[in-house]
């Protein structure tokens, strides 16, 4: 499920919706909206292809796993992490 995939692959940089590399670009709802990452499609693209300091996970995770993570991130952002 999205939570366990997130814990295993994303939490080292994004624990609690934060961003240890770029503190301005968190996974909190207001930042997702600000940077146009507030949809499943946008998050799937970011996770699959990577960008800047964030590595691409397209070769490591299946499309289904990436979509599960995207849905998890959006759900957590809605709840305020």
Swiss-Prot record:
Location(s), subcellular: Cellular thylakoid lumen
Organism: Microcystis aeruginosa
Sequence positions that bind heme c: 10, 13-14, 54
A UniProt-annotated Pfam family: Cytochrome_CBB3
One term under GO cellular component: plasma membrane-derived thylakoid lumen
GO biological process, any: photosynthesis
Record carries keyword Manganese: no
Highest taxon above the source species: Bacteria
PANTHER family noted in UniProt: CYTOCHROME C6, CHLOROPLASTIC (PTHR34688:SF2)
Family stated for the protein in its record: Belongs to the cytochrome c family. PetJ subfamily.
InterPro entries per the UniProt record, alphabetical: Cyt_c-like_dom, Cyt_c-like_dom_sf, Cyt_C6, Cyt_C_IC
Gene Ontology molecular function terms on file: electron transfer activity; heme binding; iron ion binding
Function: Functions as an electron carrier between membrane-bound cytochrome b6-f and photosystem I in oxygenic photosynthesis.
Major localization listed first in the record, in broad terms: other
Post-translation changes: Binds 1 heme c group covalently per subunit.
Assembly and oligomerization: Monomer.
Name of the coding gene: petJ
Keywords carried by this UniProt record: Electron transport, Heme, Iron, Metal-binding, Photosynthesis, Thylakoid, Transport
HAMAP family according to UniProt: Cytc_PetJ
Protein name listed in UniProt: Cytochrome c6
Entry annotated with the keyword Electron transport: yes
């Amino acid at each position: 499920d999205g939570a366990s995939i997130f814990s295993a692959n994303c939490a080292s940089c994004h624990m609690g919706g934060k961003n240890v590399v770029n503190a301005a670009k968190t996974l909190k709802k207001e930042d997702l909206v600000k940077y146009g990452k507030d949809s499943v499609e946008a998050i799937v693209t970011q996770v699959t292809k990577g960008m800047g300091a964030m590595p691409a996970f397209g070769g490591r995770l299946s499309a289904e796993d990436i979509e599960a993570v995207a849905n998890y991130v959006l759900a957590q952002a809605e709840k305020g992490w």
